[in-house]
A protein has these predicted regions:
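N-terminal signal peptide c-region/cleavage motif recognized by signal peptidases
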Residues: 19-21
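Low-complexity, acidic/polar, glycine-enriched regions of mature
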Residues: 25-224
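Bacterial N-terminal signal peptides that target proteins for export
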Residues: 3-12
Length: 224
């Protein structure tokens, strides 16, 4: 049974959200709004809301963050970044296995250095943004490997195909606190996927199969 202190905290959070709703757009006050409508399991949303309640939720700040990829080709190294994405990270800095991360990317916001390359990557041979407008990552395991390093396991959904991935993560406090007490953090995460696993099986003689995914995101503790 929920103790009284926990109940009062949830009531206070609800009052705060209702007050903010009168001053800001609905999407800004609903911390899980980008992930509703069946995008993720309701239990994951509950975890994020509980983390907000407990003070363990960090929201990604899009303007000061980067989400992208790089892949080698016969001609050059192809690098791309996504301009539109939302998400958050919920974790207890002193416990393993209690974290949850969700990131939703607008595939059509992809930006590369050249229009021809960008059109190719957005096209049906690769991201096929017309039919698959979003890329989704949801985690199912977070394990600290050091004071500021961790492993993040989860599922990546790309082109309608979901596969497990493992990110190597480094966290840095962006204030005068340690990571565990920080109000704002920098999270860098990388992993490598095989594009063929996600249905990108064309142009294999031109573009490598291995694609590195990378994130460098600033995240602000919810309520700060």
């Amino acid at each position: 049974m929920m103790n009284m202190n926990k109940l009062f905290k949830r009531i206070a959070l609800a009052v705060t959200l209702l007050t903010a709703a009168a001053l800001a757009p609905a999407e800004e006050t609903d911390i899980c709004s980008p992930f509703r409508d069946g995008k993720v399991d309701e239990s994951l949303l509950a975890t994020m809301l509980s983390a907000a309640d407990d003070g363990h939720l960090f929201r990604i700040q899009q303007q000061s963050s980067m989400v992208g990829f790089c892949v080698d080709s016969k001609l050059s190294r192809i690098e791309g970044i996504f301009r539109e994405f939302k998400g958050g990270m919920a974790f207890d800095s002193e416990e393993n296995g209690t974290g949850q991360t969700m990131v939703l990317i607008k595939a059509d916001s992809l930006d590369t250095e050249g229009n021809m390359v960008e059109s190719m990557i957005k096209g049906e041979s690769f991201f096929d943004v017309e039919h698959y407008p979003e890329v989704l990552f949801t985690s199912n395991g977070f394990h600290w490997t050091g004071a500021d390093t961790a492993v993040l396991k989860g599922d990546l959904t790309l082109r309608g195909i979901t596969k497990p991935v493992v990110f190597t993560v480094t966290l840095t406090a962006l204030d005068d606190n340690q990571v565990k007490d920080a109000q704002k953090i920098l999270v860098k995460a990388t992993t490598t996927i095989n594009r063929a696993d996600f249905g990108m099986k064309k142009l294999t003689t031109l573009v490598n199969n291995d694609v590195q995914l990378c994130m460098s995101v600033e995240a602000l503790k919810y309520g700060s």
